[in-house]
Amino acid sequence: MDSKEYLISYGWKEGEAFREGGLKRPILVKHKRDKKGLGNAPGGNDGEAWWERLFDGHLKNLDVSTDSNNGSIKFTQNEAVATAVSKSSSPLYRWFVKGEGLKGTITNLGKKEEASFVVSSASSSKGKKRRRRDEDDNKVKRKKLKKDKKTSNDSESKKKKKKKSKKESKKGKKSKHSSDEGDKSKHKKSKKSKKHKKEESSARRDRKEHI
């Protein structure tokens, strides 16, 4: 179906918009026909060649020479190459599990011992620092546990003392109450005995008067 003829059949003219104030030209779209990533400028640099720079830096630190007698190639490393990011500080490198290296055709015949010594000393110093940090952390944790135990023991002893003081106060109140009741009963008995004596004396007087 031809879209142009279809629109002309409804009264549309070429070069005019469908409505008043509408677009007279179509929206231009840039088609991407290459296989590069999004956001890449056409004709620009595809990316920084970081791998080439790193490879060249490693090659500069290597000394490759041939032996005149045997005709073999000697592979020596002059300096220990330091990485840009330290293994201890990088959070991604901590979870990285290092596997076996790829074996090449060139054997390490004349490798110097100084580079290996530097690497081993650095690794040993890192291990010592980690051990010291772990020991310090353990000491701090032990001190905190001791403080918590002391505070808990002090609180328990205070609670026990409060309970004992409450019990003693209750016992003292009970003893006072019992002593007060005993005094009241004694006072009542003394009053009754006095009344009884008065009645007996009055009865004796009456008997004497009758006689």
UniProtKB/Swiss-Prot annotation:
* Main localization of the protein described in the UniProt heading: nucleus
Q: Where in the cell is it found?
A: Nucleus, Nucleolus
Biological process according to GO: ribosomal small subunit biogenesis
Q: Which GO terms describe its cellular component?
A: nucleolus
**Keyword Nucleus among record annotations:** yes
Q: tRNA-binding: present as a keyword of the record?
A: no
Report the InterPro entries cross-referenced here: PINX1
Which spans does this entry mark as compositional bias, Low complexity? 116-125
User: Keywords, A to Z?
Assistant: Nucleus, Ribosome biogenesis
Region Disordered, as annotated, extends over 115-211
Q: Which regions are flagged for Basic residues bias?
A: 140-149, 158-176, 185-197
- Write out the function statement from the record: Trans-acting factors of the ribosome biogenesis process.
- PANTHER family recorded: G PATCH DOMAIN CONTAINING PROTEIN, PROTEIN TMA23
How this chain assembles, per its entry, is: Forms homooligomers. Associates with ribosomal complexes.
According to UniProt, the name of this protein is: Protein TMA23
**What is the organism field in this record?**
Saccharomyces cerevisiae (strain ATCC 204508 / S288c) (Baker's yeast)
Q: Which gene encodes it?
A: TMA23
